[in-house]
C-alpha cells in the first residue's frame, strides 16, 4: 500500500485524513482502518476520514470509519478537521475563510474555516423524538427528557438527542468521579438503544459553562466529541440547566456551542489542527 495521509486533531480527538476526491468509494476498508487506527501497531487515531467527491449540490462528501471499523453518521470534531483539510488541499492561506457544504450520512453540514484557526459548523437542527434517536425509552413520537434508565445497578435520569447520530446525556454532580470505562460500554450497548449510543456525562458549573466526559459509540473514551457537546448543550437547555450559548469543557479543551431556540440549528466552534503527514 502506498497512500498519502494527513493526521489532524480537534481537542485531542485525532483522525487520519485521506484525499479521496478522485474516487466515490473510500480508498481503505473498515478492516484496514482498524489496523491503521491502532495506537501500538498502526498510526494511531480515533478514526479515518475520507474527503470524497460532491454529492448533489454540495462541495464534498465525508465518510468516516471509527477505530473499531464501524461507520458513524457524522463526527463533529471530524468535520472541523475535514474542513481544515479541504482548505489546506485547496491551497488557502491560514487567514482565508472558506465555507463548505459537506454531504454526510446525517445530512448536509456546513463548516466555515475562520481566520483565527477555529472552525464554526452549522450542525443543523437537533432531533428529539424517540424514534429519531432511536430509543425504546418512550413511544416513537415523544421526546426523551429526564427519563429514568437503569444502568450499572442504579437509575440515571437521561435525555436523548440526535445530532444525526444518537446521544444519551445525563447530568451528574462530579463528572471526574464517573467510572467511564465501566459505565460507557453499559450505556453504549443498552437494549434501549437499538443502534447503540454515544453517552455524555455533564457537570453544570454555571449556566454558561458545562464540563463533559464522553464515551463514543465505536471509539470508546475520547478527549472530545463535537456532536456530543452539541447534544449536551441542547439537553441542558431542555432541562433548564443552561443558557442557549455556553462553553462545553472537554478533557481535550473547550468548544463554544449555541442553540438559540427549538427549531434552530446548533452552532459549534472549535479548533482543527494538522499534526503531521505520512504515507501508508
UniProtKB/Swiss-Prot annotation:
Pathway: Amino-acid biosynthesis; L-lysine biosynthesis via DAP pathway; DL-2,6-diaminopimelate from LL-2,6-diaminopimelate: step 1/1. The record marks 167, 216 as: Could be important to modulate the pK values of the two catalytic cysteine residues. It is an enzyme of class 5 (isomerase). Keywords: Amino-acid biosynthesis, Cytoplasm, Isomerase, Lysine biosynthesis. The active site is at residues 75, 225. It catalyses: (2S,6S)-2,6-diaminopimelate = meso-2,6-diaminopimelate. Its main location: cytoplasm. GO terms for biological process: lysine biosynthetic process via diaminopimelate. HAMAP family: DAP_epimerase. Catalyzes the stereoinversion of LL-2,6-diaminopimelate (L,L-DAP) to meso-diaminopimelate (meso-DAP), a precursor of L-lysine and an essential component of the bacterial peptidoglycan. This is Diaminopimelate epimerase. It comes from Cyanothece sp. (strain PCC 7425 / ATCC 29141). The lineage of its organism: Bacteria, Bacillati, Cyanobacteriota, Cyanophyceae, Gomontiellales.
